[in-house]
Amino acid sequence: MKRNLFIALFFFAASVPLQAQQSPFIRLTETSLMHESRATPSPLDKEVVNDRFVSFQWPLPLEARPEGAPMDGFEHLVKKVDKSKLAYKIRYAQDADFKKGLVQADTRWPFFNPEKPLTPGIWYWQYGYVDNGQTTWSKVLQVTVGDSKQKFCPPSLKALLAKVPKTHPRVWVEKENWHSFIGQSMNKPERQWYLERADKVLATPMKSVKDINTSQVKNLTNQMQINSYLTRESRRIIDAEESNTEAVIRAYILTKEKKYADAAVKRVFTMMDWDKDKNVKGDFNASALLSLCSMAYDTFYDQLSDAQRKQLLNAIKEKGTDMYKHFNNYLENHIAENHIWQMTLRILTMAAFSVYGELPEADIWTDYCYNVWLARFPGLNKDGGWHNGDSYFTVNTRTLIEVPYFYSRLTGFDYFSDPWYENNVMYTIFQQPPFSKSGGNGSSHQNVARPNSIRIGYLDALAKLTGNTYAADFVRRTLVKEPDYMKKALLNKPGDLAWFRLQCNKPLPEGPGLTALPWGYVFPETGLASFQTNWDRVGSNAMWSFRSSPYGSTSHALANQNAFNTFYGGKPIFYSSGHHIEFTDAHSMLCHRATRGHNTILINGMGQRIGVEGYGWIPRYYAGEKIGYVLGDASNAYGKVTSPLWLKRGEQSEVAYTPENGWDDVPLKTFRRHIVHLGNTGYIFIYDELESSEPADYTFMLHTVAEPMTVDQNNGKYVHVQGLSGRGGASDAYIFSSGALQTDTTSRFFVPAHNWLRADDKGNFKKYPNHWHFMAKSEKSKVYRFATIINTHALKHPAKAPEILSDGRIKAGGWLISVNVKTEGNAQFFIRSTKESVSISYKAGQETVVNENGYETRMSDVLPELEI
């Protein structure tokens, strides 16, 4: 089968002063590669921008850089910044002295999008901080603008606003197209879904904000728990009534029937001030009410009285102003402000355009929302990955589709031509193939047992909007098994795209499907990789995933640098453990986020830092037809937690970052993990290079979540660990090491998984199951090496143990492996197939060399493009 060859061709353009280094090996010394708040300008000095328009961005002044609230509901603890006093200047020209063709502008935010795309060539620019009328300019920066004909250059705000209708409705349907929209909806199943739900709502009594359950507050031990509990319980009421009311509003748009209008207006006016109740917590609740008020204003504009319109405008003004005050001079500089990215920016955007021209504040809201989208959205980087992981990725679904689709409808410009979306299709597919468990990264990944209906709806939208046939095949394979699968997402707060499907009449494209994809894909900026053996039959697919990320473990990311997971038949085997009970709950922090919960390595029993400081990266990778390779570097990930934001979170959650809990300084100098994908055999080879400045011990970890592991140490050459999927799959790991290993297995978490937060509708708190943990601890040594062969296969076909030949080579799965696991000599390995012309070799400090089909590929370390 013909496969495309994917080789690392990324060039570094960030603030790490190492790009001139000639050695194949790069040793990083930076405290972090990313920052919670922007620390570098964009574009970086001497950067070449070829694929999109130039958006100028720069750091906030030092005194105005908030860390953000440690948690939702703790905004009162954040340093207050008088944003009205923040002002900036920018100037740019193709003349380094700024004397010819100078463009200069004032801005209230630390970014600026030129009204017209810059012409190809070299440009010079400066940003300035304005204080009491005096401007402090940055150094002169240089950017080269490429002349790619495929460059993404969306319209300016001025062009967009000229297309905003002066009539209502204008957001969820345009008044002039309303009749035809209703007609086009008649043959679509989504229409009936909304009407069925709306009719059910009309027959059901409405809940009240007084129904918020506060009964457990007395049993909670700190303010974090109390706030989290009330946020969850108030969202239980408000989210339910928001979706009910939204169903009725959408039913009215689909029918123009008065019964829906009357019921929806009554509900919105009942809920309008629920956010003022003392038991209502969290920005999602406030944004839900803003969403309903703006939907009602836009949809029922012609039915509302002047007094009702005024009341809704006042509510929109109050809630929208609060959101804008929070967003501006914060969101645009933040690495990834979760709730704003997920939902609340989308809600403010739709509210702003609903009242544009009728509420003066909407002038600045539309300006900010549109231009910050162009500057920062839709993705966090170019490679299309999502650093927060698969569970929290889908919480961004409506934002990623509805906002640019709204802009596309207004202007006629294709906002989905942003190259990020094509890359994101690859992330969405490779990190969770059809009917398979997620890759195992990010908070709550345990809950994602198969691509959910939101994910399928997202791929459906991207297939139609970008013409991506891989996404289309993914959707078809799902819907042939369960035709109404996407209905499960109906009125899901962050993920329902049923309304998009009513608006969009494009069919799923035809063309190459999943079997035309390469076996593996790497996202170097996000720090993720995954490889498969069978795209066509999930039941026979042996998959593995890997993470070593410049984002570290901030936000919803985990401290799992250089960690891998294995899967068979779509079910996890060796897999990240622990439960996401709450963002900073003790179990969540010490057993789910912390390194001890993942298939990686502890140094002197200590794990990786929490925050952007606990970072890894992927220096080299290769995805070919017969072999694949990923190198992760977690040398800088370990040590004491130093992030001010995470120290504050720990303090408020009563989580101590102590040696007893797994954090301390360690003498680690190098931790590089090589993983070789040995064709479609189900075998992978893992080689760990470990070195410290003084003798240290190294603990190799494996975890399972379905069934216990079995451990066999009878063979004096290796330790054999078998993990089971519980559904007919197995991974057999054969661990070779520099010396004897002290092993231990347990089914107990370091901290019990106590559910104090997540009750069902009847108030029952489900119990979280235990997982199984294997640890193999080395003796103390400055240098140590592990070499692990893992065979992932169907349990009915028992694994054959590796054969150790007389010359010390290892034979496994049709491959011959020569590897140095001794502490003496260079770290090195050589692997070749016994059946085909393919090999890979590595020696410490030198290039990795792959020979495949007569072609040689030599890989040196390459830093990915990073900014913030």
Each language-model region and where it sits:
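Pro/Thr/Ser/Gly-rich low-complexity, intrinsically disordered linker/stalk tracts
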Residues: 22-76
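Low-complexity, Pro/Ser/Thr- and charge-rich linker/hinge segments at domain boundaries
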Residues: 24, 143-173, 711-712
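Recognizes extended acidic, P/S/T-rich segments that occur
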Residues: 72-75, 79-120
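Extracellular fibronectin type III
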Residues: 132-147
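CBM-like, beta-strand-rich accessory domains located in the C-terminal region of large
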Residues: 170, 580-868
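Aromatic-lined, polymer-binding surfaces characteristic
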Residues: 194-195, 219, 226-437, 444
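Carbohydrate-active enzyme catalytic cores, enriched for enzymes
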Residues: 355, 395-573, 779-785, 802-868
